């Protein structure tokens, strides 16, 4: 469990940066295969899926703050806009642009 805590803390501190499994393994002082297995057994998801979820959560916060979409993607740690767009749409069912428009519309209605 302590290994997973170390990994989660590292991810939180470096979310907007490129994070590799090798870096995480070095930070936790274990092999890549061990940290992947330990993380999956505790969190019921892969490290990469966890990172993706956290980056999407951060991107949503930026979109709600009316930060430009490409900048929101970049600040959330997505280095490739098309990957961000595809990932966002697959998780939320709408594009980042549609999400932003709905959020702004909801705010206007309040």
Where are these regions (language model features)?
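Short, structured helix-loop boundary elements
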Residues: 1-4, 21
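…primarily DNA-binding HTH/wHTH and HhH modules…
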Residues: 86-110
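Terminal helix-turn-helix DNA-binding modules in bacterial transcription factors
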Residues: 9, 13, 18, 22, ...
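Short coil turns linking two alpha-helices in DNA-binding domains
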Residues: 31-32, 79-80
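Catalytic donor nucleotide-activated moiety binding site of glycosyltransferases and closely related
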Residues: 28
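Short hydrophobic/aromatic patch on the recognition helix
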Residues: 35, 39, 83-84, 88
